[in-house]
Amino acid sequence: MAQALGFAYRMAVPAAIGVAVLQSSIYDVKGGSRAVIFDRLSGVKETVINEGTHFLVPWLQRSIVFDVRTKPRNIATTTGSKDLQMVSLTLRVLHRPEVQALPKIYQNLGQDYDERVLPSIGNEVLKSIVAQFDAAELITQREAVSQRISSDLRKRAAEFNIALEDVSITHMTFGKEFTKAVEQKQIAQQDAERARFIVEKAEQERQANVIRAEGEAESAETISKAIAKNGDGLVQIRKIEASRDIAATLAANPNVVYLPSGGKSGSQMLLNVGR
């Protein structure tokens, strides 16, 4: 019995050591990640390890895992425009590391490569591009400015083996003086538009009055010619038409009775029969 216990004890120690060695030699690379191997004898190996379970030599080697999925990052800076106006800009950058360059990225920058590189090159490119435009141009040509920033920033990031999937301006503000000047300009433009509308309306009314006056003058001239040609006949026709209109109006009123006299004098009688 004692011999069996001694044998079990002697086997337990190597078995525990073996299990520990086996566990330390196995590592997992999760989905969306890649790994590089650092060897104490040869340094960082050039091979990039894909997803899955892998083995290494304990103590001599260790794995460094990188997240290779696209990640967002904001880059903010305050700089001067071409006309010396202060501009505050914020960029939203979607970035990821170049997978095949992970060993070089780890050697030169480490796992926090994005923290070391993106703010630096982002500020550099923003200041360089903004300095080429006036403050007003940054507003009116925002799309062109964004494209210039995106193009230059992609080139700079590629030098560090970082791929940029998207670059966009999410925030742009100016100094108080420029903002106030823009507001005053907008107010002046609105006042000018309002004044132009008033002038156009007055001109339209004037033209309408001219046309109306010309029409009345032509009508008066036509009537004068008709009277001169036909004598009092036209005047009598107009009187009859006016009497007919009055009769139609009074007929619609149940409280009034209209009685033509039938006399030569042309007088009529109105009777109020209202209740």
Curated annotation (Swiss-Prot):
Q: Name one GO cellular component term.
A: mitochondrion
Motif interval(s): AIM:
106-109
SS bond partners:
none
Q: Which SMART domains match?
A: PHB
Q: Supply the Gene3D superfamilies for this chain.
A: Band 7 domain
Q: GO molecular function, one example?
A: mitochondrion autophagosome adaptor activity
InterPro entries, sorted: Band_7, Band_7/SPFH_dom_sf, Prohibitin
| Membrane topology recorded in Swiss-Prot or TrEMBL | Peripheral membrane protein
Coiled-coil ranges per UniProt: none
Q: Which family does it belong to?
A: Belongs to the prohibitin family.
How would you summarize the oligomeric state and partners of this protein? The mitochondrial prohibitin complex consists of two subunits (PHB1 and PHB2). The subunits assemble into a membrane-associated ring-shaped supercomplex of approximately 1 mDa. Interacts with ATG24/SNX4; the interaction is direct and plays a role in mitophagy.
Identify this protein by name. Prohibitin-1
- Protein's organism: Colletotrichum higginsianum (strain IMI 349063)
As recorded in Swiss-Prot or TrEMBL, the protein's gene is named PHB1
